[in-house]
Regions:
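Conserved catalytic core of the tyrosine transesterase superfamily
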Residues: 1-296
Length: 296
């Protein structure tokens, strides 16, 4: 029995891995074996070294394989060598210290400033009903404060300080932060609360945003509202509350806000989390370059 089959049987019968997992490992190991045999017919599982493994990974990246695919293949080779070393089928483990490629984080999608301005400012976008006013207020609040969906749903009337123009927001792990807001959101909130209290004059729910039954809104209900509203002005695939959070951060940075200030407003523990939004400032830099460089 060859070494690969012995390892696959170990996965099946001793580790009780699914057949899908076993087949995935088999393909990765056979691919690596084919690679090093084609590279040098004298190479074997015993003689391959870390450089051969790294070259194999690089060849996959050159073919256009995603980092996640390369990491999965490397995981199979690592597992194989651990097994082979434990069974004394090889004398060393060349995959031990090899690190896989970092997965590229997708850039956050956001709604452009002109699209958000059209959505909020154009009267024809909205009706006069309680539902329309509530939807517009939710959109403005998300875009003006950058808070998370769960944070918006969790807002109570007592969390809104009109005098100080600030919200008390309860974020992840019940951490609280103060988020400022402007005159536009104040006006929208005051109008919404007035109409809400007429609609539900006897409600005893402390929530700021109530659904059509007078109860605290659910995640799904807010998601439906946001998706419907964003569909009126943008063609991006994701049209979620989190996209409005991205849009807030993008607009702040593009209009001169400092990274650490945006970090605090978003409630990020690390500024590294906020740095992903700096991709949008390239658009601003490109415009500056095109307007200023004589040869652009």
């Amino acid at each position: 029995m060859n070494m690969i089959k012995e390892f696959l049987n170990y996965l099946r019968y001793e580790r009780n891995r699914s057949e899908l997992t076993v087949r995935t490992y088999e393909r990765s190991l056979e691919d690596f074996e084919s690679y090093f045999n084609n590279r040098d017919s004298q190479l074997s599982w015993e003689s391959v070294d870390s450089d051969v493994i790294r070259d194999w990974m690089e060849s996959m990246m050159d073919k256009g394989d995603m980092a996640s695919t390369v990491n999965n293949c490397l995981s199979a080779v690592r597992s194989f060598f651990r097994f082979a070393l434990a069974r004394q089928l090889v004398s060393r483990d060349p995959a031990y210290a090899i690190k896989g490629p970092k997965k590229q984080k997708p850039l956050p999608q956001f709604v452009r400033e002109d699209e958000m301005n059209r959505l909020i400012d154009v009267p024809e976008m909205w009706g006069d009903s309680f539902q329309d006013l509530r939807a517009r207020t939710i959109i403005i609040l998300f875009y003006e404060t950058g808070i998370r969906l769960a944070e918006l749903i969790g807002l109570d009337d007592k969390d809104v300080d009109f005098a100080a123009h600030q919200l008390k927001v309860t974020g992840k792990r019940n951490k609280q932060r103060i988020v400022p807001f402007g005159n536009e959101l104040e006006g929208a909130l005051r109008e919404y609360i007035y109409l809400r209290d007429q609609e539900w004059s006897t409600h005893d729910v402390p929530a700021l945003f109530l659904n059509d039954k007078g109860q605290r809104m659910t995640r799904y209900q807010v998601e439906v509202i946001v998706k419907k509203c964003l569909s009126m002005v943008t063609t991006i695939k994701k049209r979620s509350p989190h996209v409005l959070r991205h849009s807030f951060a993008t607009a702040m940075l593009n209009n001169g806000a400092g990274l650490e200030s945006v970090q605090k407003l978003l409630g990020h523990e690390s500024v590294a989390t906020t740095e992903i939004y700096t991709h949008t400032t390239f658009e601003q830099l490109k415009k500056v370059y095109e307007n200023a460089h004589p040869r652009a």
